[in-house]
Amino acid sequence: MASLTPKDIVSELNRHIVGQDAAKRAVALALRTRWRRMQLPEEMRAEVAPKNILMIGPTGVGKTEIARRLAKLADAPFIKVEATKFTEVGYVGRDVESIIRDLMEVAIKLLRDKEIARVGSQADDAAEERILDALLPPARTDDSSANTDNSTRQIFRKKLREGELDDKEIDVDVASNPAGIDIMAPPGMEEMTSQLQQMFSKMGNNQQRKSQKLKVREAYRLIRDEEAARFVNEDELKVQAIDAVENSGIVFIDEIDKVAKRGEGGGTDVSREGVQRDLLPLIEGSTVSTKYGMVKTDHILFIASGAFHLSRPSDLIPELQGRLPIRVELSPLSPDDFQRILTEPKCSLTEQYKALLETEGLNLEITDDCIRRIAEVAWQVNERTENIGARRLHTVLEKLLEEISFDADSLATQYHDKPLVLDAEAVDRYLGELADDEDLSRYIL
């Protein structure tokens, strides 16, 4: 993270997301500020609040994608939730504190995977020795026999590494995994049922081992996982996970506009103002109890987003507005943006479809005028019907390539080594009537 300046972060986001420079700069600064905070003396570090962000923009313009790419870039615990899934404390449904509990689970998995990767070579060596022990009889004690046994072991080790023994069956002792007790959790009670499951599993599981007959390939995988788990210090892992969540955690709250109170209608709404009020202490800073320990939310970065079609940011309660100090407006996408989305990002949509059809032996070539026409059709349909942003490109491309994809195997034989060329005329042929007919495009595109 130390080497990632705001310019580097924006540059990396540009590889995957077209436009929306203001939003990219805002999240890049928020991420860099977290690193800067960690360099401060401890007394001042505690006073620096995270730069929470409110993203405002229509659907399909890149709000969620920016947050998703940012999390990968930061290599930090990240969770995306929808505000509409939560209810006020005391009502049936999930309460907002479950966001932090879920974030802790993400952090535990992230750090455990890293730790297992770190001790991978040790686990590989231990698994290899156990497989060889199962393949060969116990070593003899006299010197001449011991040398012979060692030579045989090295021969088998070479065969094992080269995969020659993968399909051979052996008897191995592995930890038994007794069938767990599944408890259907009512909304909001996931934490309690998780604790009950842990309690029952500990009561019924004394780490018993059993012998299984497995192929070497499967046995190696099981034993490697078992050996890797032995090298992981679970207590230390919990401490590191709590620290990672408290100082590096990112929570992305989507559909925040759906819990904004519209107009001056009377009465309380369980899934609106109550959820906003419950979010306040979480965003401002509170302590949440999880099964791994107490987690402080003071320095978790919160990014909220919403389209705000039927409501405005000012419809959020004032206290919540104050806790999302940085506001970024994302602009609607133009036909030129659509054209860039189809070609510029790494693993763009057109590259994905080409790669998928290449697996059938069909070489697809999409011309520039074809891409221009696809972008125009997608933009026109958005203008005439519901504007769903760049997601419309998925629908248009899927419809355009439907027949080609269905007949890909026969087309591959027909075209041999020649590419199948798609141009603007092909777009008009496949989509022209649908795009021009508003009623049809409303239901099909």
Swiss-Prot record:
It is found in: Cytoplasm. Coiled coil: none annotated. SUPFAM superfamilies: P-loop containing nucleoside triphosphate hydrolases. Keywords: ATP-binding, Chaperone, Cytoplasm, Nucleotide-binding, Stress response. One of its GO terms (molecular function) is proteasome-activating activity. Pfam families: AAA (PF00004), AAA_2 (PF07724). The keyword Transferase does not apply. ATP binds at V18, G60, V61, G62, K63, T64, E65, D254, E319, R391. The keyword Nucleotide-binding applies. Belongs to the ClpX chaperone family. HslU subfamily. ATPase subunit of a proteasome-like degradation complex; this subunit has chaperone activity. The binding of ATP and its subsequent hydrolysis by HslU are essential for unfolding of protein substrates subsequently hydrolyzed by HslV. HslU recognizes the N-terminal part of its protein substrates and unfolds these before they are guided to HslV for hydrolysis. HAMAP family: HslU. A double ring-shaped homohexamer of HslV is capped on each side by a ring-shaped HslU homohexamer. The assembly of the HslU/HslV complex is dependent on binding of ATP. This is ATP-dependent protease ATPase subunit HslU. The lineage of its organism: Bacteria, Pseudomonadati, Pseudomonadota, Gammaproteobacteria, Oceanospirillales.
